[in-house]
Regions:
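Conserved pre-ATP/AMP-binding loop-to-beta segment of ANL
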Residues: 49-52, 166, 180-204, 211, ...
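Conserved AMP-binding/adenylation subdomain of ANL enzymes
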Residues: 223-246, 250-353, 363
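Conserved AMP-binding/adenylate-forming core of the ANL superfamily
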Residues: 53-107, 124-129, 176-180, 220
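Conserved AMP-binding A3 loop
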Residues: 64-68, 200-226
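ANL superfamily adenylate-forming
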Residues: 146-196, 304-355
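Structural core segment of the AMP-binding/adenylate-forming
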Residues: 11-12, 84, 111-177
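Conserved ATP-binding/catalytic segment of the ANL
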Residues: 418-485, 502
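Conserved small/polar residues in nucleotide/adenosyl-binding loops
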Residues: 1, 205, 529-536
């Protein structure tokens, strides 16, 4: 999420650390990021022990954990990991959709100094085998029997794997049983031994070669970005009564960042992965901010247009959309619409705009979007109806957002300013580079790629960009041959083209899909003749 470039790709060129433009958004106050990420949850329990902290769907409604309840659960799970023999630096994998158990296990793993290795439930057997072997995973938590069977099918290929738990089969209860003989003192000693520059997680992301690379993120990396966000965007995460419905995969680094930011700040974290009920979940949970890729908002706009139809209602919707865009463009220019435009905007607020906003629940006042370039017309439409879409940019290698627009300072067409304490630069070849404590330690088992992509502290993003005099960043292109779909997925066209062209009937193949909700291909075919005579062809 918030990702124009989800991963760094290998390159044959040597990156330069010379910047022709540079902008730093200074911290408002010093940050102490030499902590264990569990400290965020522990501090939340101390300052708001009974407040709802994690909520999940059950029995037709929402159930909740208070901060104290969730912290105590995480401690019990951490003791279980210690009792199971998990050592500091061991890799523990979670193969599951987003659910509250994922978050509890993640916090427990990191609390005792082990490394969380997320795996998408959609990953193939071969991908799981690669990730487990590269990270040397010792324990795995599978969501259900299907994920367990996937892991068991490659168990013989992974010598490091000692035990597999199934979440749906009582994994958390079983893990807690291993910790019954582990003292509180032993847990806190392990917690205090892991902090700052110790690894917290290895997040695997595919590159242009298609081979997953593990991005090493430390407790300091993630803690810094959370504390930076508290300074940079307090309205999102530090104001009272803030609520976040997280339906993104927790295997994605941005979802993990938001999980931790919830504990660091004041957010109540709602967890759901059922996209079929997401509109009902918006209504019942009532998030105060939304997180989604541009494709989600495209679907909302298209659905509203289709419901209006082609008659009078359809014409009214098109006119309402034009007025919303005009209103937004005038606001961006620091102007007001003429009185007729203001009158029309007020009318459409009652009959069109308000109805669209209700899709996102009763409390949402803005949305953060990224993962793919945002169409400016769509941004102006939603801004004009009172639901600003704040575009941002980030990478797995930066733990989450590098920059994001703010409700009070939103320049449509840019990806906002750098987060607090983050420096952005433009290299002499136009590449956007990033520096700060949010930059990963490097690539697991790939020191050569690390040395190539992180030069003198500068992370080379592979994207071309510009920075204006106020520090707002724009993406102007990409150095790499990589397609990013409207849903934020990175697709390497070369791999697909090569696979298609293995067919004897295919002459040429060109994969397309940038900014589209699909990936397609233009294909030219060979004519295969069975007769040697041109006259008979």
């Amino acid at each position: 999420f918030l990702y124009h470039a989800e991963s760094i790709q290998e390159s044959m060129t040597v990156n330069s650390s010379t910047m022709v433009k540079e902008f730093t958004n200074p911290l408002k106050e010093p940050i102490d990021d030499d902590i264990n990420l569990f400290d965020f949850l522990d501090r939340r329990a101390q300052r708001d022990p009974d407040g709802s902290t994690v909520e999940y769907k059950a029995d037709g409604g929402w159930k909740s954990f208070s901060a104290t309840q969730f912290r105590d659960l995480v401690i019990a799970l951490g003791k279980g990991l210690i009792g199971l023999g998990v050592k500091k630096g061991d890799a523990v994998s979670i193969v599951s959709r987003t659910r509250w158990e994922w978050t509890a296990l993640d916090m427990a793993i990191m609390a005792v100094g082990a490394l969380t290795v997320p795996v998408y439930e959609t990953n193939s057997d071969a991908q799981v085998s690669w990730i487990f072997n590269d990270s040397q995973a010792t324990i795995a938590f599978a969501e259900d029997d299907g994920q367990r069977d996937k892991i068991e099918s490659i168990h013989d290929e992974v010598q490091s794997l000692r035990k597999v738990f199934v979440i749906d089969a009582g994994a958390l209860e079983a893990l807690q049983a291993y910790g019954k003989e582990v003292s509180d003192e032993e847990f806190w000693a392990r917690k205090n031994d892991a902090h700052g520059d110790d690894l917290a997680t290895i997040v695997y992301t595919s590159g242009s070669t298609g081979t997953p690379k593990g991005v090493e993120l430390s407790h300091r990396n993630l803690a810094f970005l959370c504390l930076s966000a508290m300074q940079y965007m307090p309205r999102a995460c530090a104001w009272p009564d803030r609520r976040l419905l997280l339906f993104l995969p927790l295997s994605h680094v941005f979802a993990r960042f938001m999980e931790l930011l919830s504990f660091c700040g004041t957010l109540t974290l709602g967890l759901s992965s059922d996209m079929k009920t997401i509109v009902k979940d918006f209504e019942s949970f009532g998030p105060t901010l939304l997180l989604a890729v541009p494709r989600v908002f495209e679907k909302v706009y298209n659905a509203a247009s289709q419901r209006a139809g082609k008659g009078i209602a359809g014409k009214m919707f098109l006119r309402a959309a034009d007025v919303a865009r005009d209103w937004s463009k005038a606001e961006q220019a620091g102007e007001k619409l003429p009185w007729r435009g203001r009158l029309a905007h007020g009318f459409y607020e009652l009959v069109v705009y308000k109805k669209i906003r209700t899709i996102f629940g009763p409390n949402a006042d803005f949305a953060i979007t990224g993962g793919a370039p945002m169409d400016a017309n769509l941004s102006h439409f939603f801004n004009g109806i009172g639901m600003p879409l704040l575009e941002g940019y980030g990478m797995t290698e930066t733990c989450g957002p590098v920059c994001v627009s703010l409700p009070e300072n939103n320049r449509i067409g840019t990806i906002g300013m750098p987060m607090s304490g983050v420096t952005a630069g433009i290299a002499d070849d136009g590449e956007l580079c990033v520096r700060g404590h949010l930059v990963c330690r490097g690539y697991h088992n790939h020191p050569d790629v690390t040395a190539e992509q992180i030069v003198d502290g500068w992370l080379h993003t592979g994207d071309l960009g510009d920075i204006d005099e106020d520090g707002f960043i724009s993406i102007t292109g990409r150095k790499k041959d990589l397609i990013i779909t409207a849903g934020g997925k990175n697709v390497s066209p070369g791999l697909l083209e090569a696979a298609v062209m293995t067919s004897p009937v295919v002459n040429q193949c060109l994969v397309i899909g940038d900014r589209k909700p699909f990936v397609a291909a233009l294909v030219t075919f060979c004519l295969l003749y069975t007769s040697p005579s041109p006259r008979d062809r």
